């Protein structure tokens, strides 16, 4: 399993708008994409304008196919006005499920 983590700082006070975008656009349009196992939105308890999205994928190939897709590019472009310039995306391989 592979994980894509996107971290970012939003414009001050933009969290509610971002959360609405995430639930109405990201979660809805990516549901059923090949290889996507789960998706989560996390909000910092220390900074209300900081968040992380975590998506879990069956394979690195599935993750990369999504990341390079037109859909992913469109969603990123639609959300970019909510960020204040601090943003990164990283990929990880799950080495231990802890189960």
Please report, for each region that a protein language model flagged, where it lies by residue:
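A common structural junction motif
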Residues: 73-74
């Amino acid at each position: 399993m592979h994980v894509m983590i996107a971290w970012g700082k939003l414009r001050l006070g933009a969290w509610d708008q971002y959360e609405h975008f995430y639930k109405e656009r990201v979660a809805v349009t990516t549901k059923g994409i090949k290889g996507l196992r789960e998706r989560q939105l996390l909000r910092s308890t220390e900074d209300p304008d900081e968040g992380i999205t975590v998506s879990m994928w069956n394979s690195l190939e599935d993750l990369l196919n999504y990341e390079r897709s037109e859909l992913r590019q469109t969603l990123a472009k639609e959300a970019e006005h909510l960020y204040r310039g601090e943003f990164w995306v990283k990929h990880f391989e799950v080495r231990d499920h802890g189960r």
